[in-house]
């Protein structure tokens, strides 16, 4: 028996402007040249990466970059460390720089702090592409932590400058700042969180509350997806995380449910539309 679900897609979900810019740039060159190298996944969404690979996108890692000569290589929205630009120059590689302007601004601020001999802490995910690029601005001397508990084991300087990965939670950032000040440190905090991402937290919570159930669509590698899914769960306990329509579990829905679909800033709208069609077919 058909479940007769009413399904809406959150109009504010989908790619942020930084990702749109990188993908538009890639598609333009793929159309002209038929292929393009990209340093790391262009976006943390396997389905979108597969779509672009089919058009000729070739994903390489940093270890493969020194072996390339006289090629075009796309730098994705996450940005890159100075070392990448140095290798490109040596190997006559044309960099198609699609670094997000918000990330570039943050890189410049961190570089300025480092040049002024400030001690730098970065609230961010270990090993994340953006964070690696940020650390590169400090000759990898900045201390990265993703949870304040990590700092319990570290001897911190009496004063330091605190930065954040652009997709982190604003509330968590300020809670960390307040806690560090409470512990007696002199903290110069730079709120460098992208407002297109942070504004989604509030809007997404309001969206999730309107529905019986929420289906959140995101790549499993997306940091932003993890944070936004937590927002959904907080607003609506019946929120379900999937990466593609094949992961839909029909048993969690009941007849005439009102379903809201939303996603990360790395989730393509076409994928959310496929999920909508799959839910409406149940």
Residue ranges and their predicted role:
Residues 1-282:
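The feature marks the mature, well-folded catalytic cores of soluble enzymes
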């Amino acid at each position: 028996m058909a479940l007769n679900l009413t399904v809406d897609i959150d109009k504010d979900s989908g790619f942020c402007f930084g990702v749109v810019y990188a993908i538009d740039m890639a598609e333009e060159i793929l159309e002209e040249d038929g292929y393009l190298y990209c340093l790391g996944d262009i976006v943390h969404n396997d389905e979108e990466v597969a779509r672009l690979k089919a058009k000729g996108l070739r994903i390489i890692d940093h270890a493969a970059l020194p072996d390339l000569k006289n090629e075009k290589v796309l730098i994705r929205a996450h940005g890159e460390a100075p070392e990448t630009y140095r290798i490109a120059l040596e190997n006559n590689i044309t960099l198609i720089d699609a670094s997000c302007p918000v990330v570039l601004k943050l890189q410049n601020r961190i570089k300025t702090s480092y040049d002024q001999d400030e001690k730098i802490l970065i609230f961010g995910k270990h090993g994340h592409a953006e964070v690696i690029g940020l650390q590169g601005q400090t000759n990898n001397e900045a201390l990265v932590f993703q949870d304040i508990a990590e700092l319990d084991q570290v001897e911190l300087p009496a004063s330091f400058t605190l930065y954040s990965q652009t997709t982190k939670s604003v509330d968590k950032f300020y809670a960390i700042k307040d806690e560090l000040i409470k512990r007696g440190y002199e903290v110069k905090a730079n709120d460098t969180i992208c407002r297109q991402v942070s504004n989604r937290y509030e809007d997404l919570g309001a969206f999730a509350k309107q529905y019986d159930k929420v289906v959140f669509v995101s790549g499993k590698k997306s940091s932003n997806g993890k944070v936004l899914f937590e927002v959904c769960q907080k607003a609506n306990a019946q929120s379900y995380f999937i990466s593609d329509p094949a992961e839909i579990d029909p048993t969690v829905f009941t007849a005439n449910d009102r379903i809201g679909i939303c996603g990360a800033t790395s989730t393509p709208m076409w994928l959310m539309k496929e999920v909508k069609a799959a839910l409406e077919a149940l």
